[in-house]
Amino acid sequence: LTAIYYKSRATLPDKVRATQQDGFLFGEISGQQIVLEHNHKFLVDFVEGQKTGFFLDQRENRKLLGEFANGKNVLNTFCYTGGFSVYALKAGARLVHSVDASEKAIDLTRKNIELNGFDAEQHACVATDTFDFLKGKENQYDLIILDPPAFAKH
């Protein structure tokens, strides 16, 4: 164990957020770190990344995708780190498109695709609004991952 970083402020109500401080409880790391999940490598920024930097609650869903992606055309919307894209490519997807409105997320997805040994022939990243991208895309994909961020606070 190298470090423990406490990060909860982004998900807390404003009144509670003002009393909390994100930071290291043990050790310290900086910048992007490589993590391994089911033999897949991912660059993760625990400090500056969205929420925890990598959504661990989706790890079994990413693994499950691998059972269905072989030979398929896959669209990963709101891709963030490209986790689902990496799993689809490793499973033998014919083609994977990753879409996110954030240039930073698209850059991270590209890095994670390269980190796992894939090239641009099998994968394309698109930095645009997912809903705009989906218009007019009927029957182009066999599998679509649609895991949007929260659009409204509770």
Where are these regions (language model features)?
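Conserved alpha-helix/loop element of class I SAM-dependent methyltransferases that forms part
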Residues: 56-72
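Conserved SAM-binding motif I beta-strand of class I
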Residues: 95-100
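S-adenosyl-L-methionine
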Residues: 102-145
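Switch II (G3) loop of P-loop NTPases
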Residues: 148-149
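Conserved class I S-adenosyl-L-methionine
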Residues: 71-80
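Conserved SAM-binding loop of SAM-dependent methyltransferases across substrates and taxa
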Residues: 81-94
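Non-catalytic substrate-recognition/targeting regions of SAM-dependent transferases
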Residues: 1-54, 63
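Conserved acidic residues
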Residues: 2, 72, 94, 142
